[in-house]
Amino acid sequence: MTDQDLVPLPSREARQWAMFCHYSSFFWFLAPMIGNVIGPLIVWQLKKDMDPFVDQQGKEALNFQLTFSIVMMICGLLAWILIGFPLMVLVSVVALVLVVIAGIRANEGKPYRYPFCWRLVK
């Protein structure tokens, strides 16, 4: 039995809002390069006081999307030497998979921490 097994699950509503914090990054398809940050930021700001789990997962989603945006900008600069485009595809696929995993874990009530993420928002 781990310490995490002893912690009670967040409420269903809190789990759903935490999941939506992660999945709101798909606003990237509507507004490239800003939608992925705006979505989690709005959801987190509206619901962070609802439950500590939503606050934690909202910060995690926002930090990952900020990191993703910075990495995509770097890939854009590297496009001048032709390596940026394949890196953009790779980074996008990895980000998509990680966001889906994070959303599933949040819906299960398990906290998720993204790998390779700068935690700019504390």
Across the structure, where does each feature detected by a protein language model lie?
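Hydrophobic transmembrane alpha-helices of multi-pass, membrane-embedded glycosylation machinery
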Residues: 39-44
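Juxtamembrane loop-transmembrane helix junctions in multi-pass integral membrane proteins
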Residues: 9-12, 16, 56, 79-82, ...
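Residues at secondary-structure transition points
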Residues: 11-14, 33-36, 48, 52
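Low-complexity, intrinsically disordered extramembrane tails and loops of integral membrane proteins
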Residues: 1-14, 115, 119-122
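Juxtamembrane transition segments at transmembrane-helix termini in multipass membrane proteins
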Residues: 94-122
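Amphipathic, cytosolic membrane-interfacial segments at TM-TM junctions
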Residues: 47-69, 104-113
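Hydrophobic alpha-helical transmembrane segments in multi-pass membrane proteins
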Residues: 19-38, 63-99
